[in-house]
Amino acid sequence: MGSKVRQQIEAQLKQRILLIDGGMGTMIQGYKLEEQDYRGERFANWHCDLKGNNDLLVLSQPQLIKEIHSAYLEAGADILETNTFNATTIAMADYEMESLSEEINFAAAKLAREVADEWTAKTPDKPRYVAGVLGPTNRTCSISPDVNDPGYRNVSFDELVEAYSESTRALIRGGADLILIETIFDTLNAKACAFAVDSVFEELGVALPVMISGTITDASGRTLSGQTTEAFYNSLRHVRPLSFGLNCALGPDELRPYVEELSRISESFVSAHPNAGLPNAFGEYDLSPEDMAEHVKEWASSGFLNLIGGCCGTTPEHIRQMAQAVEGVTPRALPDLPVACRLSGLEPLTIEKETLFINVGERTNVTGSARFKRLIKEEQYDEALEVARQQVENGAQIIDINMDEGMLDAQACMVRFLNLCASEPEISKVPIMVDSSKWEVIEAGLKCIQGKGIVNSISLKEGKEKFVEQAKLIRRYGAAVIVMAFDEVGQAETRTRKLEICTNAYRILVDEVGFPPEDIIFDPNIFAVATGIDEHNNYAVDFIEAVADIKRDLPHAMISGGVSNVSFSFRGNNYVREAIHAVFLYHCFKNGMDMGIVNAGQLEIYDNVPEKLREAVEDVVLNRRDDATERLLDIAAEYADKGVGKEEDASALEWRTWPVAKRLEHALVKGITEFIVADTEEARVNAVKPLEVIEGPLMDGMNVVGDLFGEGKMFLPQVVKSARVMKQAVAHLEPFINAEKQSGSSNGKILLATVKGDVHDIGKNIVGVVLQCNNYEIIDLGVMVPCEKILKVAIEENVDIIGLSGLITPSLDEMVHVAKEMERLNFDLPLLIGGATTSKAHTAVKIEQNYKNPVVYVNNASRAVGVCSSLLSDERRPAFIEKLDADYERVRDQHNRKKPRTKPVTLEQARANKVAIDWDAYTPPVPAKPGLHIFDDFDVATLRKYIDWTPFFMTWSLVGKYPTIFKHEEVGEEAQRLFHDANELLDRVEREGLLKARGICGLFPAASVGDDIEVYTDESRTEVAKVLRNLRQQTEKPKGFNYCLSDYIAPKESGKQDWVGAFAVTGGIGERELADEYKAQGDDYNAIMIQAVADRLAEAFAEYLHERVRKEIWGYAADENLSNDELIREKYQGIRPAPGYPACPEHTEKGPLWELLNVEENIGMSLTTSYAMYPGASVSGWYFSHPDSRYFAIAQIQDDQLESYADRKGWDRIEAEKWLGPNING
């Protein structure tokens, strides 16, 4: 079954262009069906809405579907598509109809079969065929649905395979002639579908023709998951489909170039079924059948087509007109393309005879890179991604990823890293080489990559049966394969053995498995030379000669190898090692080696190796002398301190001899203030007007800074230093400008403010500096700014844009309020939203819909410039807003469709699953020093030892963990400078008392009552001082507890006398005044630095005080002896959760804490109306001592808990929703 149909269709495709039907959804919409129509009799009492479930109509309205099929066949269609676009179990879950998936697919195929057979009987000379449709599902296997967690997936490859397998079996059983995998927006979904289809074919002993059709989503020419047309083709070419095509998303005008490209590269027949143009403002398709037919006729005449049909907006009349347009037009002839290995990431990589040497990046390999191994072990995935990115930037055309290390879960690490790579276009644009000695790791990796990658590696060492089994699966996954020259006897060391093993493997793969020879890559084993063992001297020669043998005897196979192996004897002397690599590769490449696993950033050019060294290396590599190893060892020491490509540093002050404009640019880029006044004055004297110095060399220099920052070649601390230089230069010129009454032009005026109730502004300040560096005038209203003031100043100053910032969750509601007021008062300014607690989802769902003008979520300082320039550009603004609106609509749609990852439970069920603590067997520790303890003007020197520096670097957008960030190839040097500046400032803080650190803590008798905690006035426990209200996790936890903080305090009825602690600390007394002083001097760098340092001191104080409480004040861990790193990693007993954070997310609970400690009177810290702490550099929270206590996140709560909490707090529902919004709205 299947082969006969394929032969019939192929014969027709060579004679004429065949017609596929048109839009099924379009036709169904024309019937204007209501809910009861979708339900029919059978589903009249279904428990959820069914309107829109078009696939269900094959069961509830089968005659209607048959009518549509019949109309398309009458119009001239040759192939009917089954009405099963959303009929997988995954898509049917939207209607809770997963169990009906198989029945729907079977019924749909059966209906189409009946109609096709009726029409074939009418006109036997024109047989009609049924294509069983497998749609894309509503989930993506290579894209995270959560912008905050790019490694997360809401569907797995295996789940897709299972769903598609069930649908495929039913479609075949129902009578489908072909399988159509269509509207592919995520190629990994399609690879899972193809895997399922092929598996079912093998299972049932059938092989139907397969059609593949992808979707180019917009003018970028890429699928939604980011692939170009050719990359998409390469990824699925292994399916060997009857046809390859494109459908949906675009009309014929927009789709034409991609169909043309596909017709050029596809070895299969080419299909297309475009939409009837692009949707109009009402979502309708306007392209008439006649107009569409004109496009189709031109495509056909240009030789692009073998099959044509319609998608959204098309009707039987469109198909009728198309049939007339292509009648008599010669179909596209299949091209005779050269044999080549066609790989892909987001972009294609085709390796042909003429292709130069392919570099495979080796640094993302835990067995070969100590740094990468450390990053993966420490779960520093952002930095690990940077290693991959650097490999690609340095010229790697493929990256090899290996996680085989004894202390790692290699499979989990491989999946996590590959999923993260998928969200980084600079990395995922190249093909992936999945490298492991463990088959389960390789297979897990193949399930994560949408492109066509390479498996590294398989061999015959475990025998032929295992080798064949793995090879068949690799082919089904759609990957190329590296085959090691290794069999049951062992590794091939000699030239003869290398060819013998490779020839044996080649014949098995090509003749028995059917593996494409161009996808076979042999690694004939590169071994170290110059080891001092005579038997090793010819290893390089054996490899070089085996390359020529394999290329000669095994057509289309390629050669690769781990190049660094050859120089292993000289580890520690990188210069000599790279020279060996250069010489070795030179000779391998001459003999036909195609690719090599190398450090892409450390490849030396053969001709650049010093002649003396090159000759000695060639003697070793080519085994030309008996004493070659000794001669190379003799001269190797001369090169021990050299590095490939290093140059001598120029004189440090050579730039002082440059023209003044270049000196100003250099000072701005390097952040040098030493000569800026003198150089600015020299430029002023030589200028006609002082303003020319600003608008000329100074702005030219800042433009260079902006470009370098935008390209990632400068980092945020450097940009802030550049701004300091600029401000000093402008300050020198201002008196001269004022004397001449000149004023310069800016790119726009932007008002920035931290909203009412919030005191955090480091991020806002950084955005302001970056915008100033790009010639925007900034009006910074500071913190705690009421809505009325923001809008009043915006009008008075005639600003172009308003930017709002906030860190705590109540600030989100204040931002909504500002947006509503702007709408009410008919503002027409763009509104920017930023800050740690903000998100694109909240902006799209909660803010943007309250204001008709642009509302833009800006997630970092580097994006602010591009956003502002687009918003203020008459030319770019319309397209920017159109794209923004579409993006927000998508985000809202995702939010509305989002289902919780975990199943919710009732509050009663959650309470029944509280933390199980045997209170009878536990005696809570009695504090050594109960009551209040005040720490006034605390010693900063003591706190410095407790600083966690990693968040400090994150403040400056330098990602990396302290102290390893100093070794980072890109940001390490800047991090060291930043660290030095921070410590210099801390020295001043100590010497001059610039900042004051104050703190307070207290330990109080307490008992839990349900989810709450009663705190007593004294140890008699007769009078309740405060009740601490808590929330409980409310999701299903089959293997764990539903945590609540009260679980860690002994219940009142237990009779146990327990205690709870409270604390509040600040490192920021005086910080605001000092920052303002720096700003007044034009020194934004130190203004931001003092804020960042104060934040670190506050966190350090919290860490110090908690340690002191554990060891001395409470004293339950008197013998504790932890390093600062262990403190940061929370290796101690007990926790200190903070109100407003995940375990107790509701901010008003700071109120009882403030009252218990009398914080404002004792240490001068206060709370705003939104319960933000002032000074901003402050920390507060609770102390729990129980050894089982742990941190957790409350996440989403249900309505029953919302009402319970409101009742306990004495709130109405509106007030509860205000404070618990993030925990009830998602």
From Swiss-Prot:
Locate the residues binding S-adenosyl-L-methionine.
D948, R1136, Y1191, F1192
**Top-rank EC class of the record's enzyme:** transferase
Enumerate the spans annotated as AdoMet activation domain: 898-1226
Q: Name one GO molecular function term.
A: zinc ion binding
Q: Which PROSITE patterns match?
A: ADOMET_ACTIVATION, B12_BINDING, B12_BINDING_NTER, HCY, PTERIN_BINDING
Q: Name one GO biological process term.
A: homocysteine metabolic process
Q: Name one GO cellular component term.
A: cytosol
Q: What's the record's note on cofactor binding?
A: Binds 1 zinc ion per subunit.
Among its keywords, does the record have Cytoplasm? no
According to its UniProt record, the EC number is: 2.1.1.13
- Which pathway, per its entry? Amino-acid biosynthesis; L-methionine biosynthesis via de novo pathway; L-methionine from L-homocysteine (MetH route): step 1/1
Entry binding sites for methylcob(III)alamin: E695, G757, D758, V759, H760, D761, S805, T809, A861
What's in the keyword line of the UniProt record? Amino-acid biosynthesis, Cobalamin, Cobalt, Metal-binding, Methionine biosynthesis, Methyltransferase, Repeat, S-adenosyl-L-methionine, Transferase, Zinc
Instruction: Tell me where in this chain the B12-binding N-terminal domain is found.
Output: 651-745
Per UniProt, residues of the Pterin-binding domain are: 357-618
Q: Where is the Hcy-binding domain?
A: 6-326
Task: Please name the InterPro entries in this protein's record.
Answer: Cbl-bd_cap (IPR003759), Cobalamin-bd (IPR006158), Cobalamin-bd_sf (IPR036724), Dihydropteroate_synth-like_sf (IPR011005), HCY_dom (IPR003726), HCY_dom_sf (IPR036589), Met_Synthase/Corrinoid (IPR050554), Met_synthase_B12-bd (IPR033706)
Domain of life the protein comes from: Bacteria
**Known catalytic reactions:** (6S)-5-methyl-5,6,7,8-tetrahydrofolate + L-homocysteine = (6S)-5,6,7,8-tetrahydrofolate + L-methionine
Miscellaneous information on this protein: L-homocysteine is bound via the zinc atom.
| Domains (record comment) | Modular enzyme with four functionally distinct domains. The isolated Hcy-binding domain catalyzes methyl transfer from free methylcobalamin to homocysteine. The Hcy-binding domain in association with the pterin-binding domain catalyzes the methylation of cob(I)alamin by methyltetrahydrofolate and the methylation of homocysteine. The B12-binding domain binds the cofactor. The AdoMet activation domain binds S-adenosyl-L-methionine. Under aerobic conditions cob(I)alamin can be converted to inactive cob(II)alamin.
- Task performed by this protein: Catalyzes the transfer of a methyl group from methyl-cobalamin to homocysteine, yielding enzyme-bound cob(I)alamin and methionine. Subsequently, remethylates the cofactor using methyltetrahydrofolate.
What protein does this entry describe?
Methionine synthase
Q: What organism does this protein naturally occur in?
A: Vibrio parahaemolyticus serotype O3:K6 (strain RIMD 2210633)
Q: Which gene encodes it?
A: metH
